[in-house]
Structure formats: C-alpha cells, structure tokens
Curated annotation (Swiss-Prot):
Pfam families: C2, HECT, WW. Essential E3 ubiquitin-protein ligase which accepts ubiquitin from an E2 ubiquitin-conjugating enzyme in the form of a thioester and then directly transfers the ubiquitin to targeted substrates. Down-regulates Notch signaling pathway by promoting N/Notch ubiquitination, endocytosis and degradation. During development suppresses activation of the Notch signaling pathway in imaginal disk cells. Residues 15-58, 303-327, 394-539, 558-586 are annotated as: Disordered. The keyword Flavoprotein does not apply. It comes from Drosophila melanogaster (Fruit fly). It catalyses: S-ubiquitinyl-[E2 ubiquitin-conjugating enzyme]-L-cysteine + [acceptor protein]-L-lysine = [E2 ubiquitin-conjugating enzyme]-L-cysteine + N(6)-ubiquitinyl-[acceptor protein]-L-lysine. This is E3 ubiquitin-protein ligase Nedd-4.
Length: 1007
C-alpha cells in the first residue's frame, strides 16, 4: 500500500546492524516479547545436516529444571488448500505456535513463522526447538491470514499433545505428519476453515555423550586441535544445549535471549557468558569471580551495598597492546588481558622473569605439541613460576586479570572457544608456520611484560610525587594510582573505591558507555577552601566527585572540608540532544543493547521513560482533560442534522498551487449546502492518493494557511503577536468581493466543525464572543492590545478631564486620517467621570464590532449554513476556540502515552526510544510539522491525542516498522500511521525524519 512520499532520494545502501544479545542486568527493565520473531526460513536439510553450522530457532521460554523436561523439534513445512480470505482469492498465511499447559490452557511461549504472500499452498520449512514437559504441555498451531488494516483472519488450528511423539535416533527415519485444520472451540467462531498443515515433530535424543567432550580435553568446555594435522578436527558440538549437560555450578543460571540463543548468568559476579560453565572451572575461577564482582560494584558505585563497602578496590590501568603479528588468518577472540603489577618501591627483575617465562614456554611446547599457545600464556599469568620475585604473588597476578575491550587486530591472550581454536588449527600449513607462530607469540608476550613494567614504574613515580608534595595543586594533574590491599588497609570499612582511576589513553572506549562522563580530576574546591594535607579530589566516570585520602589509601564520597557527601551529578547530555539537565537525583545510562534507561536514586528505581517528559518546559504543557467539554461535544454531535437525499460523497478536485482559488470556486458554487455535509473526497491534481480522511485533513490545513494569510487582506494580526488573527476592517479596499470570501470562509469553518477537522489558525477572543453573540468587555481588550487596554483602564480609574477627550476617535486608513463619532454629535461631547463608562463601552464596540460588522455577518452566514448558530451557544469562547482550532502547544508525554506500535516495535524498542528523543528535542513548531506530516493536521483535539480521528472514527497515533535504513519515513494520514524504518543510529533517524518532514511533496496510494 502506498503512502505519503518524502520526495527525497535515498542514500546509498547502509549495512544492517546485527541484533544485540540480551544481557541480564540488575534493575534494567526488560522489553516485552516481540510480536514477530526473526525466523530462519528455507531450511530443507535432513535431521543429520543440522550439525553442520545450522542453528534452529529456539523457544523464548527456558524451563530450567531437570525434571521430565526435554527438547522437542518442530518443523512447520507446508500448508495445503487453505481458505481464501483476500478479495483477490488468495491469503497471506503465517503460523503461530503456542506452548500451553494442558491444565488451564495457560500460554507459556509463542513463536511465529514468516508470512507467505498471496498463496493458498504456502511453504515455510521453518524449524523451532521447544523445551517441554510432555505430561504437562501441549502445542497449538494456529494459521492466520495477515491483514495490515484490520485484525488477522483465522484460517484454522491444530492442537498437538506431546505424550506419544517419536524420538530421534540414529538410523531411524521419522516421517512428516499432515493434520486437518479445525475451527476454534468457541461457540461464536464462524470462520470458514479448510486445508491441511504438514508438520515434522520429534523429541531430540538427549544423551550425555552429546554434550561431553573427549576425554583428552583438560576442560569440559574446550577442545585442543592437533597443530601438526590441520585436517583432523573434532566432531561439531550440538548447536543447542541438551539435557545431558552436568548441573550448573552454584550461583549460575541458564537463560535464553530474544533470538533463542542460550547464555549463562553468574549471579555471584553479575556477569554473563555464552559458554556453559562447569564445576571445575567454576572453582578454579572463584577468586576471579570475586574480582569481577568487585569491578561491578565499582562500576555501579552509586548504590554500592554496605556489605561490599569494606572491600578494597584496585584501580588498574589497562594498556592497549599493539599487534606485531603479521601472520594472516589467526582467529583470536579478544576476551581478557593480563596485567601484572608490583607494589610500590619494590624492584623487580624483568630479565629473570622473562627468561623463566620463555624457558617454560619452550618446555611446554616440547612436552605437548597439541597444547594451545594462548592457553599457555593465560596459565603462565595465572600460575607464575616458583623462581619469580616474592612480591609478585599469584594472587596479585590473578587479580590483575580484567576483561577489557581491545581494538580490532589485537591478538588474544586468553583461552579461545573450540570453534575459534578449530579455525586456527585448520589454517596451520606445516612445521615452519608453527615455529614462526611460536616465535611471534613469544616476542609479543615479552613485549607485553616490558610495557607493563614500564607502566608500573611510571605509576610508582607519580604516586611517590603525590605522597611527597602534600599540596592541593596536584589535584589538577592526571595520574593513575594503583592500590593493593594490605593488612592495615583491610580494617577500613567506611569507604569504597567508586571506580577505576585511569588515564584516557588506557581507559576502555565503548559506545555502550557513551552516557558516562570520562574520568577526570579537577581542583574546583581548591579555589574556595583547600583540601586537608594528603587529600585529593577526582571525578568518577558518572560525573560524581569523590575524595582520596593518600595517608590511609581510602576513597570516599564525603568531602573532608564540610563532612557532606558530594551531590549526585546531573547527567551530561550529548551534543545532539539539547534537552537540558535531568531532575535532581536522576542518572541516565545505556543498556547493553544500546537503549537508554534512567535511574532514580531518590527511590532506587529504574525506568525507560525519560523523566524530562514530565517537565512542561521541555515536553510542552499538559493537556487538561475537560469532562464538561466532552459532554457538550457529544450533545453537539447528536443534535447536528444529517443530510438526506444527497450522494455518498462530495468530490473536491484542486491544485496545490492554487488551492484558495479552486476551493473558493467549488465551495461557493454549491447552492444545496447539504452536499457539503456528505463525505468529502479530496483529490490533488497530479497525485494518486485515495482520500479516506487524510487528504481531507490536509486540505483543511493547507486551505487555512491561505485563507487566513494577511497577504490577501481579509485578516490581519492583532497588536499583541504575529499569529493571533482578527478581521481586517479595511478588507473591502483589498478585495472588492471580500464579503463573498468571508461567506466562503464561514462555510469552510462550518465544514471543519461538522466533519471533525481543525483549522490552522487562532483568532482573538472577541471573535469567538461575536460568534456566540456575547457582549465584549474591557478584559477582552487586554489580550488584543495591551497599550490600548492600559489607556482605557487609566480612564476608568482616574479623572479623564485632564486628557480633554471627546466621543470621537481618530482613524488612520492607509495613511489618511479620519474621525469617527462614537455617537451622534460625539465630537462636541467631553469625556467626564460621569460618562467615562459609556465612552469605554462605545470604544470597545467600535473597535471590535462596528468596524467589521459586515464581514462578521457574512462569515456567520456561511458558518450557519452548515452548523446552526444556536447549537454552538452551549460552548463558551474558550471551548469554541478548541472546537474549531484545537490545541496549539503539543504535549509530548500525552503524545507518547497515546501511541500504538505495530510490527516488531514496542514502547521500549531502541528505535522508538530514538524517535521520542528526537521529538523531545524538536521545537513546538517542528512537532506540529511532524504531526501534520503524519495526521494531516498540526492541531491536537481538545482532550489530547486520545481523541485523534482517522478514516473510521477515533484512530490513535501509530508507528509501524517498515523498510530499510536507506528509506525515508512515510506517513498514512488516513490511519494516523508513521512507517518508520529500523535506522542504525539516533542521528540517522533524526536526520531522515527531518528531511522527510521538510521534503514532503504529496500523496500516493491510500490516505
């Protein structure tokens, strides 16, 4: 279905980003399940082919108990002779698979296949893996016909019990089953059902042999590749976990992300990983887990637990390592980097250490040619040789192992996964290649040790200088402090190191951490009051200031000068978002998948919604709901007379370049005004849009711009501003047919009210009072002309005789002066205390009523031909303004709360977050233009976005996923829907959206 086009040429094709994996986080909100999961279609392999790199989709539900649960393989193959639902005799079928409980029919999980367009015999060939309990669960297959305009049509269902299903075994062939589609069991189900659904289903054989590696492996999760025989590789492990695995270690949990991939959560260290942990490597890395947990507490130092506050925290700088390895094709996975350190003022024998490492390296190579070289480097750092200096203990080296994000091309010095290791082994070309590889890795390892020793020496020099100076001026210098727990340090439990303190050149640089402020030191407090001796001040990565006591080697949030904690920072915005600071006590962070969430440290809660949406200065004034107005409007609509004996629609064919003249000619020529009350069908010349409400709103919007343009001389701006309009009393001098035009404008205003559209104009308050035939008082003058109002107020409150005024006013018409008597003989009547009230009343009547009486009479004549004037008298002047013109200021929070999402989008989707961030950064004018681009009108109804109207009545603002990042957004004004492509970044989305709004040219298709 076509839609409003942006009229802009799309940019070159951009790469589509890969989906981010979900990572378990403490208080980070979880998004709701997607409406339609990404599927793997077109796979026609046999059951034996699944081991060759093919990974089937898995259920989103993960049953994490080891009772009678097992894996069930489902392959949705084809459908035959389905029912016809589309008007052209075809359907767009897809299958929804529900995993339900037998008792209570409670839904556990749902997945969907892809939609096959315009066919009654679809072929899906999509495979799914469910973890089920056969005695408690069942599967329900429902076939639907996708419909983008209304709800999807039901084509039939199959209910499958799981008790007697076959199990896959080697040498056994399991056939496909064909099931007849049946209707729902509900009494009111009347859908026409026919056809069959072909399905393959079988339990996956789950044995311990499938999950256990060969006995020759030193680790249950890793395999070693023979370096001398690149052609021999171990068997490919099963692409999905099975029930044959050993039990998870204590504190671990198995989960699945939105794409069906299994990952493992370490609740002790609060980390996640793809590889399944075992009890062996869990115990061997317990101290590493403790260190990672400490790292986590430092990173989220705002809400550190009291039980963790006593732990000493190391501030380790990670050195980036240059890759001097020129051998192409090495498949290393950067995971961890090892950093060794020595306590301050302790000399280390670099040459001895490096020589011993080299000897052990060669000995290890000679003993076992199959050992992985990267494993040796990792183990040599975790288990140092016995002759190493006593100051460099195994614990200190082990604590230095930190996960870092290194630049591309940096070789790994940690154990790689079996697939990476196999890839590296396959590329081994012979003994010469192996020797060159050993030599290069050894050189790299020695170079890394030298770099670490040099960095430690620099750190010790900086630390010694800091201890000697004892002056606050050192706070302005950037340095790195390495602190190791000692016996006297372990007793201090009143503070906790808030974060790692590192130089910008060695600090992790991640896009996911772009909401944090880089760590820095400042000496702002030194200007007011110097810090005590041996104290310094720094800024944590989140922007909060903390203090360092070098005497006791402690850090604290408490300012030693006044005893108060440093204030929470207002998160610094990025340059593209000039939205102002966050409220006090709030912090913005970026989730692992790129979405932004907000932390309220006052209540210790997290949320996806930007708290600035509640700030009317940023998001716009809130729309006050009026129940009284709602009742009046319903009464008004019920008493409007419906036309009889008229055609189904009234066609209006116009040109955009002459919309005022064409509309005036068509509307003024209508003698039977009931025709104007029928359904409007607007067509713009040269455009193929079909008007189902959107084009009519566009017509009213564009015509309002022209009708009320002061350029034509019919209206003029009031003295207060340049957007509030009043009737030009000299309109007859600009247009001889001005009264006919005012009647035409009255008809347009009446048609807008009758059809529930809005005019893009705002009139002065006396204009609405004249429509309601209410008297105009002095207070109404204040909003039109403040100076004139102040003059009349002075006359009202003082004796006007000193001004020597008469009942006669001077009038300037196009430079010609003239006098107008407010009453007969007024030029000879002085204004006194006795008659000043009469004078003020006559001035107001002449200013607002008498001068424009003919124009207003023609306007009401045209308006009354559509809407009886007695019906609008139930409204006051404020409500009449909202009835005709809507609300000018747009409340983004109300807009967001009354928006629907379709496709894969939901309220917390990253694309939707970027969209609302862009809207929040827009000015009110740009928000109005966006609203006009999508709905056809720039005005909001009286009670907000909940009362937006579409082609068939109330229609909420809708955002649907569509297109590629190369496309511009497009709008369906008849449905108030914005088709928003999945852009790759916030700036790209904002730029494309602005260009689409500003480059909109017309309509094409249904609108």
């Amino acid at each position: 279905m076509s839609a409003r086009s942006s009229g802009l040429v799309a940019a070159a094709a951009l790469p589509v980003p890969s989906s981010s994996s979900s990572v378990a986080g403490g208080d980070v909100p979880r998004p709701p399940p997607r409406r339609r999961a990404a599927s793997v279609a077109g796979q026609q392999q046999t059951r034996q082919e699944f081991g060759n790199g093919y990974t089937p989709r898995r259920s989103l539900a993960a049953v994490n108990d080891s009772g009678d649960s097992c894996h069930l393989r489902i392959v949705v193959l084809t459908g035959q002779s389905l029912a016809k639902k589309d008007i052209f005799g075809a359907s767009d079928p897809y299958v929804r698979i529900d995993l339900n409980t037998i008792n209570g029919d409670i839904n556990i999980d749902s997945v969907l296949t892809k939609t096959k367009k315009k066919t009654l015999n679809p072929t899906w060939n999509e495979e799914f893996i469910f973890r089920v309990k056969p005695s408690e669960h069942k599967l329900v297959f429902q076939v639907f016909d996708e419909n983008r305009l209304t709800r999807d049509d039901f084509l039939g269902m199959v209910e499958l019990t799981l008790v007697n299903l076959p199990t896959e075994q080697e040498g056994r062939t399991i056939g496909e089953q064909s099931y007849t589609l049946r209707p729902r069991r509900s009494v009111g189900a009347k859908s026409r059902i026919k056809g069959t659904l072909r399905i393959y289903h079988a339990f996956i054989r789950e044995t311990r042999e499938q999950s256990e590696p060969s006995s020759g492996n030193s680790d249950g999760e890793w395999e070693h590749v023979e370096a001398t025989n690149a052609g021999e590789t171990s068997a490919q492990p099963h692409p999905f976990p099975t029930g044959g695995h050993d039990a998870l270690p204590a504190g671990w949990e198995e989960r699945q992300d939105a794409n069906g991939r299994t990952y493992y959560v370490n609740h002790t260290a609060r980390t996640t990983q793809w590889d399944r942990p075992t009890v062996l490597n869990s115990h061997s890395s317990q101290s590493t887990d403790d260190q990672l947990a400490s790292d986590f507490q430092r990173r989220f130092h705002i809400s550190v637990d009291d039980t963790e506050s006593g732990r000493s925290a190391d501030s380790i700088s990670h050195n980036s390592i240059e890759d001097n390895n020129n051998a192409a094709g090495l498949a290393y996975t950067p995971k961890t980097a090892a950093t060794s350190s020595a306590p301050p003022n302790t000399p280390t024998n670099n040459n001895g250490i490096l020589a011993q490492i080299a000897m052990q390296y060669r000995a290890e190579e000679d003993q076992d040619p199959t050992v992985d070289h990267t494993s040796f480097v990792y183990n040599s750092l975790r288990h140092p040789v016995a002759h190493r200096q006593p100051e460099i203990s195994a614990t200190s080296l082990q604590n230095d192992l930190r996960p870092v994000r290194e630049a591309p091309g940096v070789p790994d010095i940690a154990i790689t996964n079996p697939f990476t290791r196999r890839a590296a082994g396959n590329m081994a070309g012979g003994a010469g290649w192996q020797q060159e590889r050993r030599r290069q890795q050894m050189q790299l390892h020695i170079q890394q040790h030298q770099q670490r020793q040099q960095q430690q020496q620099q750190n010790r020099i900086l630390l010694d200088v800091d201890h000697r100076q004892q002056e606050p001026q050192h706070r302005g210098q950037r340095h790195q402090q390495q602190h190791r727990p000692s016996n006297e340090d372990t007793d201090h439990t009143d503070s906790h190191n808030p974060s790692d303190i590192s130089a910008p050149s060695t600090r992790r640089n991640s896009e996911e951490d772009n909401a944090a402020v880089p760590p820095m030191e400042q000496n702002t407090g030194g200007e007011e009051e110097p810090l005590p001796p041996r104290w310094s001040m720094q800024v944590a990565p989140n922007g909060r200031t903390f203090f360092i006591d070098h005497a006791s080697r402690r850090t604290t949030w408490i300012d030693p000068r006044n005893g108060r904690a440093s204030p929470m920072p207002n998160q610094t915005r990025r340059v593209e978002d000039d939205l102002g600071p966050l409220p006090e006590g709030w912090e913005e962070r970026v989730h692992t998948d790129g979405r932004v969430f907000y932390i309220d440290h006052n209540t210790r809660t997290t949320q996806w919604e930007d708290p600035r949406l509640s700030n009317p200065n940023i998001a716009g004034q809130a729309v006050p709901y009026s129940r009284d107005y709602k009742q009046k409007y319903e009464y008004f609509k019920s008493h409007i007379r419906k036309p009889t004996n008229v055609p189904n629609k009234f066609e209006i064919r116009i040109r955009r370049t002459s919309i005022l003249e064409d509309s005036y000619r068509i509307i003024s020529s209508v003698t039977k005004t009931d025709l104007l009350k029928t359904k409007l069908w607007v067509e713009f010349e040269g455009e193929t849009g079909l008007d189902y409400g959107g084009l009519a709103r566009e017509w009213f919007y564009l015509l309002s711009k022209e009708m009320f343009n002061p350029y034509y001389g019919l209206f003029e701006y009031s003295a207060m501003d340049n957007y509030t309009l009043q009737i030009n009393n000299g309109s007859g001098l600009c247009n001889e047919e001005h009264l006919s035009y005012f009647k035409f404008i009255g008809r347009i205003a009446g048609m807008a009210v009758y059809h529930g559209k809005l005019l893009d104009a705002f009139f002065i308050r006396p204009f609405y009072k004249m429509m309601l035939q209410k008297p105009i008082d002095l207070k109404d003058m204040e909003s039109v002309d403040t100076e004139y109002y102040n003059s009349l107020m002075w006359i009202k409150e003082n004796d006007p005789r000193i001004l020597e005024l008469t009942f006669c006013l001077d009038e300037d018409v196009f430079g010609q002066k003239s006098q107008h008597e407010l009453k007969p003989g007024g030029a000879n009547i002085d204004v006194t205390n006795e008659n000043k009230d009469e004078y003020i009343k006559l001035v107001i009547e002449w200013r607002f009523v008498a001068r424009v009486k003919e124009q207003m009479s023609s306007f009401l004549d045209g308006f009354g031909s559509i809407i009886p004037l007695n019906l609008i008298k139930i409204f006051d002047e404020h409500e009449l303004e909202l009835l005709m013109c809507g609300i000018q200021n747009i409340d983004v929070k109300d807009w967001r709360e009354n928006t629907l999402y379709k496709g894969d989008y939901h309220m917390n989707h990253i694309i939707i977050q970027w969209f609302w961030r862009a809207v929040l950064s827009f000015s009110n004018e740009m928000r109005s233009r966006l609203l006009q681009f999508v709905t056809g009108t720039s005005r909001v109804p009286m009670n907000g976005f909940k009362e937006l109207y579409g082609s068939n009545g109330p229609q909420m603002f809708t955002i649907e996923k569509w297109g590629t990042p190369n496309n511009f957004p497009r709008a369906h004004t008849c449905f108030n829907r914005l088709d928003l492509p999945p852009y790759e970044g916030y700036l790209q989305l904002k730029d494309k959206l602005i260009k689409a709004i500003e480059g909109s040219q017309g309509f094409a298709g249904v609108d």
